[in-house]
Amino acid sequence: MPLELPSLNASIVGNTVQNGAVEQFLNIRYADIPGKFEKPVLKNDWNGAEIDATKVGPVCPQPRTPFNFFSVPDDLWEKVNVDTYQDGLLCDNLIVTRPKGVSANARLPTVVWIHGGSNIEGSIYNLIYEPQFLVAESVRVGKPIVHVCIEYRLGLAGFLTKNGKGNWGTWDQYTGCQWVNRHIQDFGGDPLNVTLTGESAGSVAVHNMLIKDSMNGRKLFRNAVMMSGTLETITPQPPKWHARLEEKVAKVTGKEVADLASLSDKELLDAQIKLNVAVCMTCDDGDFFEPGWKQHLTPDWLDKLIISDCKDEGMLYFLPVNAQDDEELLAKVAKSPVGKEISELYGIKEGGDIKSACLDLKTDATFNYFNHLLFKKMEEARNNGSTSRVYRLAVDEPNPHNPDQRAHHAVDVLYMFNSTKFNEHGDKLSRLFQSHFLRLAYGLEPWDHRNFGVYRNGGYQQLPLSELNKVRPVERYEALSKMDFGQVGRLSNALSRL
């Protein structure tokens, strides 16, 4: 029996999963894309159509992930790289997952997920982000939620500028959030109780969405979760920076800059690979990032915000760092204007474990230092009258599938979704991890705000915020705050560049 969607002038047919406890609706188009390098147009009316939401939808063209980053079991790896079809103009779709049979007036808390992948890869159809297990757990513990995953444009298709404007993938994300606000009540969700979540580039996107929502009247989100990324991780670059990228793309494709929109999906992706684009940057174009946006960096109007990171985030860069000789790494440090200070602070010296020290710098300079700064700013805002609560989470528990990978970047995603066949202990930890976010969605404290949460040594504990230095190098962060961080970032980038 199709589900009626009055606000969309449509009905919809989906799938039943989790032994009948959960319903899932795939490939719901939330926006139309008029053309390459164009803003999405919110899709509000289906003209009475019945939507077939039983099959996976198109994803943005992207390079295939070459190795098993998460060390998931072999029988699951191909499902991680699910072979969906790719289309740069049809990829604005989303997944809604909900408890079976929820009524339209249920007003369940709604959780929205934005995946990571450096703005060049990733998909809502990746098994790692499969939400049915989280929704089933929400039912089991009596805190049922509606969950939404948003697909968006990636790579040059999503972030190459045109006439000084850009951020097409970012506009997609925001339009998806607007769709949730307008239409999630048809699925039993509460548009006034939305928790926005994301990891890595998805966490940066959460920060971007909060800034935009703050400037537009704070209507879309009540709570947020930022896992390993703030706007400082992928900072908006000026139009001149993006204009240089346009020129490079034109050169490798043999096109004029004015004709780049005529490139096919394949030609754009080939250009991206030839230029070795490892991260796609947003653009400070005065459009998505409106004048004055820097005054809205601290989302101190939210009810609650969780900021989390992993102990060994820098393991993301293990391959390029490990591929270099110690002498090469030392030479890069010596050449930097902040090299002497960084060498002393991290112990990047002859006779030491140079590669591990470089990965520690990558951990701080790309992710954890910025998390620390945002947490401090939120705490300061609280002291100055903000009613928002901020919660700090440290994920130091190693990858349950391969502990040798340590608590690497994105290992927390495994615990968030619990979709990769953990052993009994890993499953228990994952359910505990999920409980924090379900409590948040229900307006409850995920843990005592006077403490921070930490996953390590096979378990979970809370420690007073005054003891954060036991699990994070707070003194090192303070030393970094006194340096020219632009130079620190350039050195960090150089260390992982072959």
Curated annotation (Swiss-Prot):
Domain of life: Eukaryota
Active site positions: S200, H409
Broad enzyme group: hydrolase
Pfam families in the record: COesterase
Glycosylated residues (UniProt): N193, N384, N418
Family annotation (SUPFAM superfamilies): alpha/beta-Hydrolases (SSF53474)
Family statement drawn from the similarity comment of this UniProt entry: Belongs to the type-B carboxylesterase/lipase family.
Keyword line: Disulfide bond, Glycoprotein, Hydrolase, Lipid degradation, Lipid metabolism, Signal
Documented EC number(s): 3.1.1.3
Taxon lineage: Eukaryota, Fungi, Dikarya, Ascomycota, Saccharomycotina
Reaction catalysed by this enzyme: a triacylglycerol + H2O = a diacylglycerol + a fatty acid + H(+)
PROSITE patterns in UniProt: CARBOXYLESTERASE_B_1
Listed GO MF terms: triacylglycerol lipase activity
Gene Ontology terms: biological process: lipid catabolic process
This protein's name: Lipase 3
Disulfide bonds: C60-C91
